[in-house]
Amino acid sequence: MEQPESWFAADYAEARAKFRAAAERAGAALAAYRNPDARQPDGGDLTTDVARLGPAPDRAAKVLIVSSGTHGVEGFCGSGCQIGMLE
């Protein structure tokens, strides 16, 4: 088991990469949705990454949605918690 400190990132790109890698290791289906109206401070794309575990939502009896980063700054903490759940 990884140490919890390894779940957290110092910036958006690192948080995104860690989340996507953890989702892939967990066997999740991944999708990314680019925000056409916003950019990172360095000009890079801002995206919402979606990791789905289990059956497609239209075939699942119950669905749990967990999100972070809706307002920006809390994304690093939320992403770390999500990575911990995936690990």
Question: Where do the model's predicted regions map?
Answer:
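Structured catalytic-domain cores with a bias toward divalent-metal coordination
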Residues: M1-E87
